[in-house]
Amino acid sequence: MTDLQNFVTNGFVLKKGLFSNKEIDKLNQYIAIRQDKEESARETTTSTGKLTMTMWNHPSEDLFGKFSTNERIVKPMEIFLNDEVYHYHSKIIWKNPGDGGFDWHQDYGYWYHNACLYPDMASCFIMLDKANKENGCLKVLRGSHRVGRISHARSDTPEQTADNERIRELEKRHESVYIEAEPGDALFFHANLLHSSDAVSYTHLTLPTNREV
């Protein structure tokens, strides 16, 4: 099955080694010295605990912009979406020991309310270190993008969550896949693909970076 067939059928494609260890090390070092990104980060809470993230819309000429507009991301996105693409926003998520994860949601569940009329959008999630079940890696419901947009709502947390009753039914029909990956791997996934992550269950520090194009 080709990457395009995987994207259409399953809603996601994991590209191994999209960026080299040297490139990821450089990006990690750059994040560590960018005080403005750390200062603009906000703490949020979900049903499983807290986590920290920062987000921005305009790709700059710095290293962040070079990653998010890199042809290794742009060209596959153009194939998957069958159109020219533009940068919508970038995000860094810090998950420290004991931090929580995200509840089941669709990215388009948020973007629909930002005047994005069609779900012709996708995300690219770049691993900045090893991602596994213990440190709260991303998990997806295979093929769930085909159900279309699901209603999202806030309960007692700041983050939106997809309708729980519908999620329970979809979990009976769609395989839950943990995206265990290495630094430099990148997950491309459709804006309607349901995804979540668990809380960090041990003391390893994880810095997954979510690049949404």
Predicted regions and their residues:
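Short, structured patches in soluble enzyme cores that scaffold and shape functional sites
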Residues: 106-108, 126-130, 142
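Double-stranded beta-helix
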Residues: 133-194
